[in-house]
Amino acid sequence: VLHSCQQLEQMGFEVTYLPVDESGKVSLSDIENAITTKTILVSIIMVNNEIGTIQQIAEISKLIKRVASSYNTSILFHTDAVQAAGYLDLDVKRLGVDLLSLSAHKFYGPKGVGCLFIKRGIPFEPQQAGGGQERERRSGTLNVPGIVGLGNAIELAESRRNMAVIHCSNLRDKLIKALVETIPGTKLNGHAVDRVANNVNVSF
């Protein structure tokens, strides 16, 4: 996402980058203050891939809609949910997102394939021109094994999500406790509570 934003800047778009606090959380007030009448898209990563901090996506969505309404405009909301699949609820209606991206290998699917949820009614143009595949939304011969593998993998990950969260969070918490108690000066990086179940990041 970062490199895509940098590429958009080179094309003439104005991009605003927001800071996070020491736990990796983005402030709702910072988001609100950054939105202007020219804002067309907000993109927030759901789970930080390094420190595991979980952002409050549903609350951010409500904020964006409220501010957009006050400006009498519409703002699209995208979340990069790559690190969240298999551990967090990705119900797009509950989250209130317009766009959500996933990568199959993060939930034990095949490498080299991902998916993008686009809310019905949102117009978009393909990145590549060519054949009429996928109703002219993506040119080129479809990677059928990859697509089927992604679909099956996310179904399996979702069916085992609750069990995986309990198992991984227990192991995570035991490891954090052991590190803190055993190695003096150990510092947990990321949010202590709003943290994905399969992440431990510490500094010594």
Question: Where are these predicted regions, by residue range?
Answer:
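Pyridoxal 5′-phosphate
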Residues: 1-204
